[in-house]
Amino acid sequence: LRRHHVVLTVNPDGCQLGLRANARGIDLNRNFPAANWKAGETVYRWNSAAEERDVVLLTGEEPGSEPETQALCQLIHQIHPAWVVSFHDPLACIEDPGHSELGQWLAGAFNLPLVGSVGYETPGSFGSWCADIGLPCITAEFPPVSADEATEKYLAAMTDLLHWHTHR
């Protein structure tokens, strides 16, 4: 029996407000209790094409301090997934440090380049935390397009992902 768990958003406040940070101004993707977590300010890249593209936010009072981060960590420990695909934007790539079979499939299905790194440090990120606990995590970074265009371009591939299985 194959089972999939889909978390629609880890940041409901940010989705509602159109922001990366939660309601407390914390960048949740720098708040995970990863070994590389850093206190203080963090930078995120909001647009890979713009000249002024880095925005400064906070990482939280301590690793895993935010309820949203805690909830996702608890879920991961509860369900013990074999792998995770985390969807983001706007860097237009599939980030898979291990260049796994799934990462290669995603790159083809989404017609995005497969990269080993997004090109800048991501301390306290979900991917860093997953690496610390030995959970394969691939980050699918969509390009900066509207929700309608993303649905048109990627919905079929996202549905196909639910049926993906290794060929080994």
Where are these regions (language model features)?
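Active-site-adjacent mobile loop/cap segments within catalytic or ligand-binding domains
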Residues: 94-96, 103, 122-168
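Active-site/substrate-binding loop(s) of hydrolase catalytic cores
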Residues: 1-117
